[in-house]
Structures are given as structure tokens and as C-alpha cells.
Amino acid sequence: MSKKLTTAAGCPVAHNQNVQTAGKRGPQLLQDVWFLEKLAHFDREVIPERRMHAKGSGAYGTFTVTHDITKYTKAKLFSEIGKQTELFARFTTVAGERGAADAERDIRGFALKFYTEEGNWDLVGNNTPVFFLRDPLKFPDLNHAVKRDPRTNMRSAKNNWDFWTSLPEALHQVTIVMSDRGIPATYRHMHGFGSHTFSFINSDNERFWVKFHFKSQQGIKNLSDAEAAQVIGQDRESHQRDLLESIDNQDFPKWTLKVQIMPEADAATVPYNPFDLTKVWPHKDYPLIEVGEFELNRNPQNFFAEVEQSAFNPANVVPGISFSPDKMLQGRLFAYGDAQRYRLGVNHQHIPVNAPRCPVHSYHRDGAMRVDGNFGSTLGYEPNNEGQWAEQPDFAEPALNLDGAAAHWDHREDEDYFSQPGDLFRLMTAEQQAILFDNTARNLNGVPKEIQLRHLRHCYKADPAYGEGIGKLLDIDVSEFN
């Protein structure tokens, strides 16, 4: 017997083929409440899309510890070799809307939610170790530059390059995006990075600075612009389809988690700002340390409920993992939760995909869509005479030594914009450099020459061969930008 249709209130629906009218050809009646409910719900099915990372795919999996790092962190998910923790992953493009093609040249989001016994840990990263910006005040400007032009409502290469080249610190990220790794072939064939500098705190209350790396066990595969155009012409959901089908076919993708560890005191002595999101830490100084691996092995049963409504927030950390003075990270600690309260509501943490797997004791009350019992008759204030849900000073972090006057400090005092992009360029093979030249020149085509020259000057400062290679393809003589 087939399941029977009801209203949202559970009442039987007698007619779902024809509206109720006054006579065979008469007007529709207002008392046709099923029609009213059905259309009213339809009118409200679409929630606000994410301002960035709107197009994405997700899956559940398991993280397993393979190496001991307890001397660096007291986080229980790393407490013993073999320990497993459930997680949810969401991979995305960044600039495009929900209907954008997967195989666009763009950064990829790489967000993980670990459902630990101490609460949810959200690691909200990308497939690149750096970013365009150092200062979160410019993040809305980046968004506006890569989104649609306010006059034409089209994506604008001019706007992209005008903004990127006005921020010389963006060259490191631009170099990666324009390289052969700018279009991953699938989500399975890309690395992930926490990108920011975070901190570990161990059982002795010692702090270490840490960067997270996720190495794809499937290897790296990328698409050229021509290959991507062909893929997009056939399937705009190519990455989503690949991830979904690989898990359905039990070809479970895996990534190895590695970390770079910096003693807290080193931050004051290294010749660069270790909290600068436009720079990486040299591996020769801070080598990768293997921690574990995660496997994605279960697809969501409902995309909207589990992927679209998933919410990742870098402010969600557990004891033993914390933040750093990274300005971009500090800005995201507010922005992500605030965006989720707008997009999903103040109680979005009760949506099953976002809900912790451990007990929650909070004084947060009421709000739209509060459907979990609202903590019943438990007192809603603290301190209280019953000692309910008191603070936990045992989990206080060690003090972080800070100094300096409060001011709008200009990060441009550090003018080392070009050494690391130059190092990256020189690590490339001749073939990879040629691909970088070709991709960059193609994307700069049609952009005003003034903007082209600005980018060429930056590339030339990173390495003369970098600027010359692109300039040759744009038919611009080196004398115009050296």
C-alpha cells in the first residue's frame, strides 16, 4: 500500500490534482487550504545562499589517529592511536553561486566538522595554503570584486584583476589559482589546508602554533582550461557527481592529516610573520608531522537537510585546539557565525548535521525554530543557587603575551610580497611555468593594459622570468614593466 498524502499538520489530503472552484469554470475558492499551504510553502523553499562557497558537495566519514601528537595537544580526538571520530566534509567552489559549474578556475573550500566527545571542531579551510588577503577589513571588497558586476550582472575579469593587482600581497594566491592546480579534476584529487595558523595546547598548558595539511591519497589531478570547458559543457555538477558516485560505489576517498608545529616562542624570532595568511611556513624549518587520516564513506540522504543546511564556523574549537593572532582568522571568528544566524537562524546548531554528538548545556534560550525542548525548566541564568551549568575554569587557556598600542596598524609595513611567490615559481617545472604563463595571459586578455602592467610588475619582482613569460604572451615588452 502506498503512503498517504497529508497536510503539514498530518490531516489527509483528498485532492492533489485539481484546485477547488465555484462551478466547473468558476473562480478558485479561498477555502482550498491545501492549495494555500502547498503554494505558501513553495514560495519559501529557497533560503539565502552563502555569500561565498555557495556551490558545494558534502559527505560523512571517519577520522582515525595513526600517530601520537599528545605532547602537542590535549584534544581528546587525538588522544590515542586508532581512535576514530565521525566527521562531515563539505567541498566547494568559492566565487560562484549555487548554480555555478564545478569545474571553474577558482579556489576550492575544504571544510570539516569533527563530532568529538568534547564538542564540534570545525576546520574551515581551502585547497590552498594561503589567501589573497592579510586583513579581514578587505574581505567584503574581495567578495564584490569576484562576484557579479553591479551594472552588467556578469562576472568581470577587469574587476577581479583590478582588485587583485591593487593588493600585491595577493600574488601568492593568484599564482596558485593561475597554475596547473587552479582547476582540480575532482574534489577527491586535491589537497586541503587549514590555511590559517591555529594553536595546540597540551596537558601541561603549553602552547604551540600549528598549521593543518590534508594530503589526498588519490593523488593530484587537474584540468586545463580547455578540458574544463569540455567538462562544463557536458556536466555542470562534475565534482559533485564524482564524489557521490565514488562513495556509492564504495571507492572511498581518503586524506592524510599532517601538521606543522612551531614552538610558541619562535613566532617572535622567525624572519616573517607566522600569522600572515599570504605566507607559508618553510617545510625545512617546520616539517610535516603525520597525525592520521580521514575517509569519506557515507553520502547524505537529503542534500538540503544535510549539505545546504550544514554550517561550519572556525570559532568552534575543542580543548587543546585554539586560535592565533592571525587577523584573517580573527575576522572569521565573527563573520561565519553571524552569516549562519542570518542564513539558517539563531538555532542553526540544532539542525542534525550541525548538532554536537555530546551533551550540550547552555543558557541560550528561545529564538525562531527552537524545537529541542529549550532546556525545559532548567534555570536560564548563572550564577544560580543550584550551581547548575557552572563555568569550567579547568579548561582555561594559557595567557597569550601581547603588547603594543591599540591602533589601525598598517600591515603594508611588511613589503615582502614577492619572495614566496618567487620561490613557488622556481619550484615549478618548465612545463608548469608555461601553463602558468598561458593561464594568466588568457585570463588577463581584454583587461585594461594598465591593470595588465600592474600584474606584470608584481610577477617580475617575484622572478623576472615570471613577468617576462606572461608579458610575451600579452605582446608587452619587458621594458614596460621592469
Swiss-Prot record:
Induction: By hydrogen peroxide. It comes from the Bacteria. It catalyses: 2 H2O2 = O2 + 2 H2O. Signal peptide: none annotated. GO terms for cellular component: cytoplasm; periplasmic space. Keywords: Heme, Hydrogen peroxide, Iron, Metal-binding, Oxidoreductase, Periplasm, Peroxidase. Its EC number is 1.11.1.6. It is an enzyme of class 1 (oxidoreductase). One of its GO terms (biological process) is hydrogen peroxide catabolic process. PANTHER family: CATALASE. Either KatA or KatC is absolutely required for the protection of the nitrogen fixation process. Belongs to the catalase family. This is Catalase. The gene is katA.
